[in-house]
A protein has these predicted regions:
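Hydrophobic lipid-interacting interfaces of membrane-associated proteins
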Residues: 1-10, 15-48, 53-109, 116-124, ...
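Extended, charged low-complexity segments
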Residues: 125-129
């Protein structure tokens, strides 16, 4: 495979079989989560906000605090046309699309604001003020509660759900 850091936008074009990667030690997640599986990366970008291309993880599993969850496939495709960015995520557990002008780094705050509006007793408002974000999104879930539980034990009831909307902050 290829990992090229010689240009302003690094290029990643490789396939890997990861036996164990700790996302916390790689500075990809705050908590201690191990992942293993097969990965196929074909993208450019120096950070998550300028990621363009595709990343696929399959035959994988996550381990957090002794809890083990397997997943067969997760595919992320990111494209851009002018200022309009589109990200499509497909898996056995859910499908999601987000399209418009947005910063991936700001999405947690945006969705925290959105969820706080409808679930104020479960989700606190974000600490930081939102930047200008204009996008639409759709999410269709199948059996996702076990995965959500890994990241937020207070949220549940999202199996077999559909959520769509738009944000203009």
């Amino acid at each position: 495979g290829l990992v090229d850091f010689s240009k302003a936008e690094p290029r990643f074009d490789f396939t890997a079989n990861i036996e164990k990667a700790n996302l916390q030690r790689l500075n990809l997640y705050k908590e201690n989560i191990d992942i293993n599986g097969q990965m196929d990366f074909r993208f450019t970008g120096s950070d998550i906000d300028n990621f363009l291309g595709s990343a696929r993880i399959h035959h994988a599993s996550l381990l957090k605090n002794g809890k083990h969850i397997s997943f067969d496939s997760l595919s992320i495709v990111s494209t851009r046309e002018g200022n309009n960015k589109t990200i499509v995520i497909n898996s056995n557990e859910f499908d999601a699309t987000i399209e418009g002008e947005f910063s991936i780094n700001e999405l947690p705050n945006v969705f925290q604001t959105f969820l706080n509006r409808y679930y104020p007793s479960y989700v606190n408002p974000p600490v930081r003020q939102l930047k200008n974000e204009r996008f639409s999104f759709t999410v269709h879930t199948r059996k996702v509660d076990d995965y959500i539980d890994l990241f937020n034990k207070r949220l549940s009831g999202f199996n077999d759900a559909s959520v769509s909307g738009s944000i203009d902050s």
